[in-house]
């Protein structure tokens, strides 16, 4: 199945990643500490180390007041919290999506995400060997999308989004990138893509 296909990969070198510096509470906050106060630049809350006097707070799964952290059933507060969480996610830094294959002059860009990578890459590779100019942009991050998403998707003459569902990612991309003109290749068979079927479908798109 897609979930159990073995794929070789290199272990990341953690030394190449930027240092993560948590936002801890400061001594000045002690007398007026509110556990849900956020840094307005990134909507991240300040960390209080458990056991420190003056920084007692409770964690839980119910909706909280946007300031005090107390359980809240207020509709306006819930609406605000949903927007704050969405804004926080939108500000997460993710790497640009990379384009493989004929990145500079492809006549068709294949777009995929998740466990379909191997089959899509094989289809692209075989088509390029046959003289067809094809590229692949495989997304590892979809919320938020990489900052270069619109630039990549609008660069090529034809774009096809291949997914093992009814086109949810294609619809999401249309919503996030207005004016996007893309084709779809969708299957819901409970089985991995077949490379030959992908090549046939993509070749047909190139011939249109």
Which positions does each model-derived feature cover?
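Flexible, low-complexity linker and terminal segments
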Residues: 1-208
